[in-house]
Amino acid sequence: MMMDILMYLFETYVHSDADLQVDQDQLEDELLRAGFHQKDIYKALHWLEELAALQQTDAQTAIAKSAPTSMRIYAPEEIERLDLESRGFLLFLEHINVLTPETREMVIDRVMGLETDEFELDDLKWIILMVLFNVPGNENAYTVMEELLYSKEQGILH
């Protein structure tokens, strides 16, 4: 599954501070040896390329100019993918300044870019972490999100 590959890559190369300059062919071979399917590997790598490309788009400029009181209205397909709990979590993260409108839109874009029928709040948290890691200047937000993710996994968050 694509989400499993993304989490594997994030934990292996990003969270462990491993060498991020990995040859794509070597990476594909490693993922195949780890038991992932070629089709899913290509989808995951394409998803990551699209995440990197989001930083170069002009769409973020329009979002940055929106009024602070603006409210995000979700499209029907977004509502189908992001349940009420997930949408509430995104709103919560905006209120505590972990997400900006720009990073929220990047998260939603990448959530919609996943080819999966099953999507849960924990998956959303991983996507948020990946987006924050990939956008320069979000180190504090990344740290807060990482604490939210890992403290929940360890049963500390109340």
From Swiss-Prot:
This is Protein Smg homolog. Belongs to the Smg family. InterPro entries: Smg. PANTHER family: PROTEIN SMG (PTHR38692:SF1). HAMAP family: Smg. It comes from the Bacteria. The gene is smg.
